[in-house]
Amino acid sequence: MRPRKAFLLLLLLGLVQLLAVAGAEGPDEDSSNRENAIEDEEEEEEEDDDEEEDDLEVKEENGVLVLNDANFDNFVADKDTVLLEFYAPWCGHCKQFAPEYEKIANILKDKDPPIPVAKIDATSASVLASRFDVSGYPTIKILKKGQAVDYEGSRTQEEIVAKVREVSQPDWTPPPEVTLVLTKENFDEVVNDADIILVEFYAPWCGHCKKLAPEYEKAAKELSKRSPPIPLAKVDATAETDLAKRFDVSGYPTLKIFRKGRPYDYNGPREKYGIVDYMIEQSGPPSKEILTLKQVQEFLKDGDDVIIIGVFKGESDPAYQQYQDAANNLREDYKFHHTFSTEIAKFLKVSQGQLVVMQPEKFQSKYEPRSHMMDVQGSTQDSAIKDFVLKYALPLVGHRKVSNDAKRYTRRPLVVVYYSVDFSFDYRAATQFWRSKVLEVAKDFPEYTFAIADEEDYAGEVKDLGLSESGEDVNAAILDESGKKFAMEPEEFDSDTLREFVTAFKKGKLKPVIKSQPVPKNNKGPVKVVVGKTFDSIVMDPKKDVLIEFYAPWCGHCKQLEPVYNSLAKKYKGQKGLVIAKMDATANDVPSDRYKVEGFPTIYFAPSGDKKNPVKFEGGDRDLEHLSKFIEEHATKLSRTKEEL
């Protein structure tokens, strides 16, 4: 027994020793793994540090320093003057400019003290691009003691070097702003004395105003060089509240043109060259003088638009001055003419002190007067002249074109007849043949506007009307005040068929044509999908509040809004009286002009019982908080309190 016990004892001792060895090996392996992990982390940190060091390091390429968001501020902090170029790698002008810029860098490097020349890839250094308002490539700026000076000269070595050397002088200071600053103390004096001046009413906190500011100043500099100069001015509307109220300033920035103190709306662009071109055009006379009878005859024979002529004694005639003032109000939409010629007055069968409005020969007809006359005196109101011109600006049946659509054919209902419209010599007779058929109907419906339109110019509209495959040479449609469209059934066109069509519309017997995607088979999601055919049944449902988003599939802002909009719909899912909906406005008609879509996304709240007065979501962030607040402010059917929501 003793040997057996001894054997067992030895066996147990061996197992204990084996376990001890295994236990000793385990910790060594774990320790090794931990050490490896620590080493990997240290290597990653070193790599990150290397990348940060790479970003902070100012590299040089052919004498030009390379700056970015990370190293810019450190580099320029102690520099008096730095030349900067903001470029894009794909920009052709930047590539052409690169060799010249490298020469400039080498020249300025030799200056005592040397002036650093740097470039910034604005497509990757987005912070700097935004900070320095970079909107085009290449953009050149000179940094003087940390303040950016716009370079507006040519991209030549000589001119850039000269400007940099000028700015680098110790006594150089930026030139004062050319834009005049107006207050209630000097406003009337400055504005009343100017033949023409542009005034911006702004708010210091307004983002759009800040964006406009550099362009406005550049335009002011450019226009100050003209002879005579055209001044630009600005008014802080938050400080000068009386001036803002006096000129009905309700948003920022508001721009107005003043001519000897008389205000006119500014409807031009908001960037340097657009402002300059617009103001140069506006500074010219609103009416051009007609010197010869031949000019009038050419207007009548070859003209393509309404002819407006004022006949006066001379430039000192008070009636002429009043006519000029009225012309300024409409100069963007119509061409005004005047004459002091008695020969022309006799030809037009008018007297001095009269305004005549007439159509070129191709738009005249036996159903309407050849011309319309109005007496103009020094006391005649601008509005009276304006109303007269607008009343007779269109012929009984005019030519609707893409170029005049927005200015001439906005009145509804509009009856449009589509065919191959061509007033050139070879095709004029055919064009007038079909137009004469339209005239026979138009004379009996003075409350409607009639026009002919070339079917190719309006191919998209014809297709939306379902008429592109009609098989007929002539088609017709009616566009009404609410945005609805009505197509005439394809059949051989003549005056009788058009008359029947217009009469049926007048009696409300026509069904509108609505461009629409197919009605969704499954529309049970939190966000209801609206198409053209279901707009009335969903959005215009008088028993429900509806929040409707009009979107475009390609719109980036719409894509960003989608998850927020889905969350909003889920939040209010239990509200049976509220519908959260969306509609692809590029693939569906919006059959109501109350819901105007001028950009994407556009959001309206259509309250129950008042669908003709939807509320547009404007001004706030398109996030869950603001959209929820918008709903709760206008909802009529919420079953819970705001606190519960």
From Swiss-Prot:
Top-rank taxon of the source lineage equals Eukaryota
> Which InterPro entries does this chain map to?
PDI_thioredoxin-like_dom, PDIA4_PDI_b, Prot_disulphide_isomerase, Protein_diS-isomerase_A4, Thioredoxin-like_sf, Thioredoxin_CS, Thioredoxin_domain
**Subcellular locations according to the entry:** Endoplasmic reticulum lumen; Melanosome
Do you know which Pfam families this protein is assigned to? Thioredoxin (PF00085), Thioredoxin_6 (PF13848)
In-chain residues carrying the UniProt-annotated modification N6-acetyllysine = K366
Annotated Thioredoxin domain ranges read 21-169, 158-301, 505-636
Q: From the record, which residues define motif CXXC? A: 91-94, 555-558
The annotated regions of Acidic residues compositional bias extend over 38-58
Q: Where is this region: Disordered?
A: 24-58
Q: Which SUPFAM superfamilies match?
A: Thioredoxin-like (SSF52833)
Report the leader peptide range. Answer: 1-20
Q: Which CDD domains match?
A: PDI_a_family, PDI_a_PDI_a'_C, PDI_b'_ERp72_ERp57, PDI_b_ERp72
Q: What is its EC number?
A: 5.3.4.1
Give the intrachain disulfide bonds.
C91-C94, C206-C209, C555-C558
* Placement of sequence motif Prevents secretion from ER: 642-645
Provide this UniProt record's keywords sorted from A to Z.
Acetylation, Disulfide bond, Endoplasmic reticulum, Host-virus interaction, Isomerase, Redox-active center, Repeat, Signal
- Output the Gene Ontology cellular-component terms: cell surface; endoplasmic reticulum; endoplasmic reticulum lumen; extracellular space; melanosome
Reactions catalysed according to its record: Catalyzes the rearrangement of -S-S- bonds in proteins
Q: Which family does it belong to?
A: Belongs to the protein disulfide isomerase family.
**Subunit structure as annotated in this protein's UniProt entry:** Part of a large chaperone multiprotein complex comprising DNAJB11, HSP90B1, HSPA5, HYOU, PDIA2, PDIA4, PDIA6, PPIB, SDF2L1, UGGT1 and very small amounts of ERP29, but not, or at very low levels, CALR nor CANX. Component of a complex containing at least CRELD2, MANF, MATN3 and PDIA4. (Microbial infection) Interacts with Human astrovirus-1 and Human astrovirus-8 spike protein VP25; this interaction seems to facilitate the uncoating during virus entry into the cell. Does not interact with Human astrovirus-2 spike protein VP25.
The molecule here is called: Protein disulfide-isomerase A4
The beginning of the lineage is: Eukaryota, Metazoa, Chordata, Craniata, Vertebrata
Gene name for this UniProt entry: PDIA4
